Every structure is written in C-alpha cells, then in structure tokens.
Swiss-Prot record:
Functional description taken from the UniProt entry: RNA polymerase that catalyzes the synthesis of short RNA molecules used as primers for DNA polymerase during DNA replication. Also part of the exosome, which is a complex involved in RNA degradation. Acts as a poly(A)-binding protein that enhances the interaction between heteromeric, adenine-rich transcripts and the exosome.
Species whose genome carries this gene: Nanoarchaeum equitans (strain Kin4-M)
PANTHER family: DNA PRIMASE
Superkingdom of the source species: Archaea
Name of the protein this chain belongs to: DNA primase DnaG
Residue sites binding Mg(2+) 2 per the record: D221, D223
Reaction(s) the record says it catalyses: ssDNA + n NTP = ssDNA/pppN(pN)n-1 hybrid + (n-1) diphosphate
Length: 371
C-alpha cells in the first residue's frame, strides 16, 4: 500500500535545491526558517505553524557533488491550498545557506487527499473484483457438483477394488467400460446404468474377470490416452469386444446425451479398431523420421529432443532427461514409464519410445507402432 503523510496533513510541498558549498542538514533547515521569517506575517511563520501542528517536520535529503550540495526537501501541511502555495513560494526566496549561494525550486505540491482518493479508487476496483470472484457462483461448476452428488447416490461399488459402477453392471449381459468415476457418473446421468469405471490405468482384477463373462464395450476419451488404456487391458488379459471413442479432444465425462449415444452407436469391433490404429501410423508421412530418430537413440541410454522438422536440438543421458529443453518432440532409449513421464510431461507434443505403459496426454509412438 502507498504511504501517506499523517491524516491531518492535506498537502506536501516538494522542492529541489542546489547550494554552492558544503553544508549540513541543520544549515539547510535553519536557512529556510531564518530567511522566510516575517515574509508572510506571524500567521504563516513556519515555526509558529509547526508549534500549532499545521506544518510537519521538514525532511531533507541531500548529497555532495564536488563543492556543491544538492537535494530535496518535503514539507507536509494541513493549511488551505492558498496558504500552502504562499509558503511554497516563500521557500523559493531562500538564496543562501550560511555563506554559500543557494537556489530552491518547488517541483510540486501534492494533494494528499487526491493521492488517497486515487489509491481508494484503484484498491476498490481490486476488492470489488475479488468480491465478485468469491461470491458470484460458477453456475456450470455448481451444476456439475449437484449432479455429481445426486447421481453418485445411484452408483454401486463393484469388486474387491470397490470400483464405481452403475446399478445394472452385474445384471446386464453387456457392460460399458470407462476410465474413471466422473465418466461413470456422466453415463448414469444419461440413463446408461450398465457402466463400470476402472479408476485409472492400472487394470483391476475384477475388470479382467468380468470381461470373461460379459460383452464389453470400451468407451474411451477422444485423445491418444485411450490407445494406452486398451493396450493395458489387453496386456492384463481382458476380453474387449468393442471400442467406442468420444469425439476428438473430448472426454467421456463431459459428453452430452446425444454425443454419448452417437459414440456408442458408432462402436466398432476390437479387431477393426486395432487395424485402424495400424493404418493411421502406417499412413503417417513422418513414419520414416520416427524410425530414424529411434534408431539414433537405440542402445545409447540417451534421449534427444527435436523440432518440427525433426532436426535434433539437444541430447543428454537418460538420467539427465529433465534437463533437456522443451521442444516439438523427444526420443528416448527406454520404455516410457510413470517416473520418466513425470520428468517430461507437458514439454513435448510427441514422444518416441521403445514402448510405453503410461497414459500420456501427448502423442506417444513406440517401436511396435512403426514396425
């Protein structure tokens, strides 16, 4: 917060001075009192005004430059504007400090109340914005919280892992498998009650066992993380019959009823989904570039980063991977695991690795994908 003179003061006189000699603070103050005495009568005598509390302490800041003394003075007053102006003008008449010639010039008279009003105006704006941000509800967020609270009551806990599930997951011959609790809540909200959440990418044993007894449609987000979820499910021995995908860039938990139904209606057999993935990678015009970059790091225990033209920018040993700069992509001589991913998350758009067991936000391409 800005500092102001005591509340009784209305104005602050600010002046500069230049003295042709070496003097001290006491000499300067003495000259101001002495040479203004009697100029404006007893009513505006500086000493009398100080005794009455209408004039504050004269503050002097100065320094010596060669054989001269230069600096500034500030004088707070509680007088009216006219009287303050007279005193300011009187100070400019001081032409000597001791035996040395002096020149005083008033720079400005600060209206303390105006400064306070400006501070109040600006601070009030800040406080008003803070107040609105705290008191004005985010309707969308409130809606989600209320829906979460309401529809969560309809969920059950499934299996020894107590997975979030719709009330018909055990009775139905077909189930919809999703990643997390928020996905389950959203589907239940829209009337899909045979849904089961996995609570992450570590595949629960209950999910694998249930997939052996029921037809399973895996419903994944519209990003590349879904590919890893599927890979982990298959690696864990789960039987997946169909795959449904949310619209590009969308998450299952945020889909509308229409979007959910459309995605589920467009589900495809697992074999076709895997085939489509292979075609997508094979048709990538940069496939050979990916191979080349992975071959450069293969068996080197290093990581390299590259730009959008696949020019190598920097490389470091894997133990120093967190020291590499942000760039378009990174290629690493190892399997992408959670520990490594934590060090590079958010720094690259593309990650090339020998293999991966991470649900990464970025695009991840492995040796299997490009062979």
């Amino acid at each position: 917060m800005a500092k102001f003179a005591p509340v009784q003061y209305k104005y602050i006189i600010k002046a500069e001075f230049e003295i042709d000699g070496i003097v001290d603070r006491e000499d300067i103050i003495g000259a101001i009192f002495g040479q203004t005495e009697g100029l404006l009568g007893m009513e505006l005598d500086l000493r009398e005004l100080q005794k009455q509390g209408k004039l504050g302490r004269i503050e002097v800041e100065y320094k010596r430059v060669g054989n001269k003394t230069i600096g500034t003075i500030t004088i707070p007053t509680s007088l009216k504007a006219v009287e303050t102006s007279l005193i300011a003008a009187a100070i400019e008449t001081v032409d000597r400090v001791g035996p040395a010639k002096a020149r005083f010039r008033v720079k400005e008279i600060v209206d303390v109340r105006s400064s306070k009003r400006e501070y109040i105006r600006n601070r009030a704006k800040e406080l008003f914005v803070q107040l609105l941000s705290k008191t004005a509800p985010d309707i969308e967020e409130l809606r989600r919280e209320l829906e979460e609270a309401y529809y969560s009551k309809q969920l059950i806990e499934y299996g020894e892992e107590k997975l979030p599930a719709g009330p018909l997951v055990e009775k139905s011959d077909e189930i919809i498998l999703v990643e997390g609790r928020a996905d389950v809540v959203n589907l239940v909200k829209h009337g899909i009650l045979n849904v089961l959440g996995m609570n992450g990418i570590n595949i629960p044993k209950s999910v694998v066992e249930l997939s052996k007894r029921k037809k399973v449609t895996l419903f994944i987000d519209g990003d590349r993380g879904g590919e890893l979820v599927l890979r982990n499910l298959l690696a864990a021995g789960a039987d997946i019959d169909y795959v449904a995908v949310a619209p590009p860039g969308r998450e299952v938990e945020e889909l509308t009823n229409k979007e959910i139904l459309k995605a589920l209606k467009s589900k495809i057999p697992l074999e076709q989904y895997i085939k489509n993935l292979r075609i997508s990678i094979n048709n990538d015009e940069n496939k050979e570039k990916y191979k080349e970059l992975l071959s450069k790091v293969f068996d080197t225990k290093k990581a390299i980063v590259f730009d959008e033209q696949f020019n190598i920018i920097d490389e470091k040993p894997l133990e120093e991977i967190d020291k590499l700069p942000s760039a378009y992509g990174i290629a690493i001589d190892k399997i992408l695991d959670n520990e490594t991913y934590a060090k590079i998350k958010g720094k690259y758009q593309l990650i090339l690795a020998l293999d991966s067991n991470v649900n990464a936000q970025e695009r991840v391409i492995t040796l299997k994908d490009i062979q």
